[in-house]
């Protein structure tokens, strides 16, 4: 499904929160949306690896990496696995790598920046807890919509206006 965040903001101004404009679009999908699943981790993508291995149909994985610009929380292998398992997209408050391959993957991916160094795998992090960055709190079970204009969050699913 194609989402246009300005149209959603115009149609649902009382429902949406707009994430501060700090993310770049790296994925093969220009727009994506779905139910939020969250991970809170810092320079350790063990939980990201576990989650992309699950059924993600209709879901967006929001990864709060603490804004770290020192390690990549997502690379081509995890992005390809997420796409195979039906994830709509990922928003990474941190870095990703292998961006040329990710750009060809049928997956929405927004992140702060790129970094070539992978993370450690210590199994540290939290799954499905509220996370806050960009002026918005992302709660599991709420909805996220993203495109080249930005990222918005809603407590309920939104329909594109006709």
From Swiss-Prot:
Co-factor(s): a divalent metal cation
SUPFAM superfamilies linked: RraA-like (SSF89562)
Record keywords: Lyase, Metal-binding
Pfam families found in the cross-reference section: RraA-like
Known EC number: 4.1.3.17, 4.1.1.112
Chain positions recorded as a divalent metal cation binding sites: 98
Co-factor note (free text): Divalent metal cation.
UniProt keyword Metal-binding, yes or no: yes
Highest taxon above the source species: Bacteria
CDD domains: RraA_family
Reactions catalysed, as given in the entry: 4-hydroxy-4-methyl-2-oxoglutarate = 2 pyruvate; oxaloacetate + H(+) = pyruvate + CO2
InterPro entries: RraA, RraA/RraA-like, RraA/RraA-like_sf
Quaternary structure note: Homotrimer.
Protein family membership: Belongs to the class II aldolase/RraA-like family.
Protein name (record): Putative 4-hydroxy-4-methyl-2-oxoglutarate aldolase
């Amino acid at each position: 499904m194609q989402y246009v965040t300005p149209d959603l903001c115009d149609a649902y101004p009382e429902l949406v929160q707009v994430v501060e404009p700090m993310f770049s679009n790296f994925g093969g999908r220009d727009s994506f949306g779905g139910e939020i699943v969250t991970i809170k981790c810092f320079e350790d993508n063990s939980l990201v690896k576990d989650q992309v291995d699950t059924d993600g149909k209709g879901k967006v994985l929001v990864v709060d990496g603490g804004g770290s610009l020192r390690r990549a929380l997502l690379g081509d292998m995890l992005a390809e696995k997420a796409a195979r398992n039906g994830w709509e997209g990922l928003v990474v408050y941190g870095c990703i790598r292998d961006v040329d391959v990710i750009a060809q993957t049928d997956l929405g991916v927004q992140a702060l920046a790129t970094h070539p160094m992978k993370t450690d795998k210590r199994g540290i992090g939290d799954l499905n807890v509220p996370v806050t960055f960009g002026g918005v709190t992302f709660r599991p079970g709420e909805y996220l919509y993203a495109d080249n204009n930005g990222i918005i969050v809603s407590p309920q699913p939104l329909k594109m206006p006709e």
